[in-house]
A protein has these predicted regions:
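Extracellular structured ligand-interaction cores
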Residues: 157
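Domain-core detector
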Residues: 1-153, 165-200
């Protein structure tokens, strides 16, 4: 148990080191992931999470770096949102977004809340509250973003982004009738295939 604890501490130290280099532009995502994997691959390690889930080292490193960089980008976006005095944000949409068959309209089902306009404070009939819908909050005074629920927007391994939005613009993720342009069934099939591939 002590060796595992030390290995995980060593991994966290290395992740912090490469996170700094990637965030400062000194190293690319790809090279950071390769460096971490090269230094630990020979041990065949897995990372155990407090939730009970377990990931291969490659999956854990990728998740950590992608999550960290997306959260950093979100903080920069939030500054622009505050400078512009925007009340609304548009959340991006992509094929293969995470979904939960047991709770298809829940926070952890990213395909449910992606591609929609949200209000930062309060809500409108056509713009739900950002925090309530996605688990992500933006302080309207400071622009600081906070992942309230790590299963939602900018949480674990989330690839979605958000940007300031003017409701007079047309949402590029929906058709003229307001329906998502991404086929939900195809997107869920792609997600399931990606999960099967990661499990191999």
């Amino acid at each position: 148990n002590t060796t595992i604890d030390q290995s995980q501490k060593n991994l966290l130290n290395l992740l912090n080191e490469v996170d700094f280099r990637v965030a400062s532009g000194l190293q690319s995502y790809s090279s950071a992931i390769c460096e971490v994997l090269d230094r630990y691959a020979e041990n065949g390690m897995n990372v155990n999470y407090p939730t009970g889930s377990r990931r291969s080292l490659e999956a854990a490193v990728r998740c950590c770096i992608v999550t960290s960089m997306n959260q950093t980008a979100a903080q920069v976006t939030n500054k622009y949102i505050i400078e512009a005095g925007a009340e609304y944000v548009l959340v991006s949409a992509h094929m293969g977004a995470r979904h939960d068959k047991n709770n298809p309209t829940g926070l952890q089902s990213h395909d449910w809340w992606q591609g929609k306009v949200y209000k930062i404070r309060g809500s409108d009939p056509d713009a739900p509250n950002l925090l309530e819908a996605t688990g992500y909050d933006i302080n309207p005074q400071t622009g600081e973003g906070h992942v309230v629920n790590p299963l939602g927007l900018h949480g674990y391994n989330c690839r979605h982004s958000h940007k300031p939005w003017d409701k007079s613009l047309s949402n590029p993720y929906v058709d003229a009738n307001g329906n998502p342009k991404i086929d939900v069934h195809e997107s869920q099939q792609l997600y399931d295939l990606q999960q099967q591939q990661r499990a191999m």
